[in-house]
Amino acid sequence: MAKLHDKYKETVSPELVKKFGFTSVMQVPRIEKITLNMGVGEAVADKKVMEHALRDMTAIAGQKPVVTVARKSVAGFKIREGYPIGCKVTLRGERMWEFLERLVDIAIPRIRDFRGLSVKSFDGRGNYAMGVREQIIFPEIQYDKIDKIRGMDIVITTSAKNDEEGRALLEGFNFPFKK
């Protein structure tokens, strides 16, 4: 079992019960899923680009991503309906905890010019979204094997009722928010 999952059960959950006065452990916010999304607009012109993006995403997430396709045709972007334009992975359970551990302990400290995560990235319902500009911050990506630096979106979906509970939950996992 992942260290962060044990930490959640042993320290984070009891702290949240004390802080917010929950009467049942089922009321305590928890992380439900983590979604990784990578938009690959260049895949329209070159099919190889999508293969590289899928390889990178598989290495980072530890599971095969789903290819996302365009819902509408957009002439300005030279995109037709059904064209592959990105990929995404939804992590739950054990893989989610392992990814979260790698994100907090290894990947975030490797971000260049990092000054803390923005508190404004909460959505009002306790979920947190962040963008990563380079996939090379993850240790699974070999620097000499990448064709292009790509970013991705990381969304952490929680069962928190509001941003305050969501922030307290993520701070329990040592997320480095700006003060």
UniProtKB/Swiss-Prot annotation:
Check the UniProt entry and state the signal peptide residues, or none: none
Q: Which Gene3D superfamilies match?
A: 3.30.1440.10
Q: Name one GO cellular component term.
A: ribonucleoprotein complex
Keywords annotated in UniProt: Ribonucleoprotein, Ribosomal protein, RNA-binding, rRNA-binding, tRNA-binding
Q: Molecular function terms in GO for this entry? A: rRNA binding; structural constituent of ribosome; tRNA binding
Gene Ontology BP terms: translation
Q: Does the keyword rRNA-binding apply?
A: yes
> Which Pfam family, any one of them, does this sequence belong to?
Ribosomal_L5_C
InterPro entries from the UniProt entry: Ribosomal_uL5, Ribosomal_uL5_bac-type, Ribosomal_uL5_C, Ribosomal_uL5_CS, Ribosomal_uL5_dom_sf, Ribosomal_uL5_N
Describe the protein's quaternary organization and the partners it interacts with: Part of the 50S ribosomal subunit; part of the 5S rRNA/L5/L18/L25 subcomplex. Contacts the 5S rRNA and the P site tRNA. Forms a bridge to the 30S subunit in the 70S ribosome.
Similarity comment text for this entry: Belongs to the universal ribosomal protein uL5 family.
Q: What does this protein do?
A: This is one of the proteins that bind and probably mediate the attachment of the 5S RNA into the large ribosomal subunit, where it forms part of the central protuberance. In the 70S ribosome it contacts protein S13 of the 30S subunit (bridge B1b), connecting the 2 subunits; this bridge is implicated in subunit movement. Contacts the P site tRNA; the 5S rRNA and some of its associated proteins might help stabilize positioning of ribosome-bound tRNAs.
* NCBIfam families reported in the protein's UniProt record: PRK00010.1
Q: What HAMAP family is this protein classified in?
A: Ribosomal_uL5_B
What the entry lists under PANTHER family is as follows:
60S RIBOSOMAL PROTEIN L11-RELATED
- Put simply, this protein is called Large ribosomal subunit protein uL5
This protein's species is: Shewanella halifaxensis (strain HAW-EB4)
Annotated gene: rplE
